Amino acid sequence: MTRRFALLLALAACSKTVQPAADQPAQTGIQLGDLDRKAAPCDDFYEFSNGTWRAQNPIPASMDRWSRRWQSGEQNKEKLKIILDELSAKTDWPAGSIEKQVGDFNAACMDEAKADALGLAPLKPMLAELDAVRTPADVQVAIRKLTDLNIAAPFGFGPTSDPHEPSRTIAALGAGGLGLPDRDYYLKPEPRFVEAREKYHAHLKTMFALAGLTDSPEQVFAFEKRLAEASLDNVALRNPKNLDHPMPFDELVKLTPHFDWVAFYKAGKVEKADLNVAEPGFMKAFDRELQETSPAEWRGYLKWKVLAASAPWLSKPFADESFNFNQKFLGGVGEKKPRGVRCAELTDQLLGEALGKKYVERYFPPAAKARVQELVKNELSAMKEIIEHLDWMTPETKKKAVHKVETFNPKVGYPDKWRDYSGVHVKRDALLANIAEGQKWEVAFEHGTMGKPTNRDFWGMTPPTSNAYYNPLLNEIVFPAGILIPPAFDVNASDAVNYGAIGVVIGHEISHGFDDQGAQFDADGRLQNWWTEQDLKQFQDRTSCVANQYDGYFIKPGVHHNGRLVLGESIGDLAGARVAYLAFQKALAAHPFKPADGFTPEQEFFVAWGQFRGDQIREETQLLMIQGDPHPVARFRVIGPLSNLTEFQKAWSCPAQSAMVRPNRCDVW
């Protein structure tokens, strides 16, 4: 698994959401049958809003978690599968058309029998090239080839908006190259990490044996451990300043003198210009490995990176072993998803805007886009009002914060300009070659943006994606069509339900512009302080309250959230709920209504939020989240923010001593 370093994309993404199957009616309101009436809303609102649903909906064997959102997300992939099956069934699409590209890619992916018959054969030419590595110069050529395949071995290389001049795109280097989820899995002594290392050792040995590799799995693990020792931990990675190391090309050469960056840049057709090195310490360690690690050890490591990346799409023994370690052991998943669903995910990954264009034509009506744009507009207005009424911020900082809200760039549904995939050459009978072709094209596309003005039309997610994000470098909030579906959003739902579900997501993403990361970027996306000293101290004190709150949330005895790791998402949840609620109150004043479900409109808003966030998560997945995911687990994404909101207490008439009323509330925005 490669590590995401923040300045490559700087995406603050919310958790996944979902869409109903074609043969199910749209759910336009809260689900009364999912409530647990035995649970008092003022004692445990998560159980009250989700208890019956959770009791009646076990996690499917192929999933690491389950919820209404995830259920609809999987049904959404079934919609992609319908499109793909239709396109791949026809073989005479015009040459170069997106229908032919997408259809042929899916046809190659779906031919599991051919993959099983071929075994390792599709990968043998690449493994043979790597097996020929004998000198330090050969190692560097191999690293360049793997970079072209979008494999971080061991560093990641990609574009980013310059954090000091976001109007231009520069190159960025970051740490990568690990096979375990993060550095702590290699270094920490706790039993779960020790077990993971033992399982990973066994996994390496099994995969090497399947591929007939004679390289040393022990040397590969030792190599990765040294990389881990040089990497920042997950909390440090959340601070943009820890990743901000701009330098000219010549300084990079001095930092890592044993790597031929001139040849690397020339091979990637990248200009030798200024760049950002996210983790200079890691790059120094990389340079030491070039000096001290033998070509034979490098050879084994590089072959492993290619094998690990390809295994899910090779024959059954490789695919099963990859699944058994990465999904079954690490995530607790019992079985693979159906091949068609996995192929839909792969096509979306590599040809996402081509497939996405077909998706929005069929499933995302103009009325839905217009309604979401209206919600976004209303919530940006609400955020401005909240800032203007803060009692702890000086007028000087308020003015800059309001200006930042006014310069937000919302994107809804799909891009105005679609990407042209005509340069991607797809064969109907060569899956691994198609994957390599898609990755090479994506890398070349990214390299082509470096040294040029930032493309503000670019989307960091594909239209069918069930997610959303805020990019601080561009001060933009992005909501793909894939998230704008029930239960997150329904054009026919009440304001209470829409503001309580997608509205809180919108508020969450807006609030990322003012969380512990986003607050370090100004309205133009520059990484620079825009706060007075007094206001910054107030902000940090208030965010520390949130971090301390989440430090106290345990998923099992001895295992709790790291409040600093989840701080940005927790601020987003708290402020996002407040922003959405204020916008909802204004909508309610303009268009009063009385719900037919026995709740007040305000209560319906909070039930919609609780049900949107409710889910089931396997313990193994929760442990992964606790370790490296900046999002809290679902239960704490409900009770955490709501227990701080006076609006919630008032809506449910909660006594001051209730469990859902914190005695010392955290209040940031």
Enumerate the predicted regions with their spans:
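Bacterial signal peptide processing site
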Residues: 15-17
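C-terminal motif of bacterial Sec signal peptides marking the signal peptidase cleavage site
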Residues: 11-13
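Sec-dependent signal peptide recognition
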Residues: 2-8
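N-terminal low-complexity, Pro/Thr/Ser-rich intrinsically disordered segments
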Residues: 19-31, 35
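Active-site-surrounding "flap" and adjacent substrate/cofactor-binding loops of secreted or lumenal enzymes
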Residues: 23-26, 39-44, 48-116
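Intrinsically disordered, low-complexity linker/terminal regions across diverse proteins
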Residues: 220, 226, 255-258, 276, ...
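Hydrophobic/aromatic-rich, well-ordered segments within soluble, folded domains that form packed cores
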Residues: 34-55, 186, 190-209, 567, ...
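Noncatalytic, helix-rich "gating/capping" subdomain that lines the substrate-entry/channel surface
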Residues: 87-378
